[in-house]
Amino acid sequence: MPIVTIQQSPRSVEMKRELAHKITEAFVQAYEISPEAVQIFFAETSHENWAKGGELAVDWKKQ
C-alpha cells in the first residue's frame, strides 16, 4: 500500500482534501489499486520551525 507524506506549511482543510483526492486518484490509475489502499499524511510545519539557506521562513516574507 502506498504511503505518502507531505511536509508543508499549514494549508486549509479544503486544500488538503483536494490534494488528497488527486494524489489518491493518481495512485489508483497508475497502480490499479483501490483508493482505500492509499494513505496520505500531512506534516505541517509553521514558518517559525522551518529554515532554508540558514534563514527562517518567517523572515523570507520580510525580504
Model-predicted segments: where are they?
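A domain-level signal for the structural core that forms small-molecule/cofactor-binding pockets
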Residues: M1-Q63
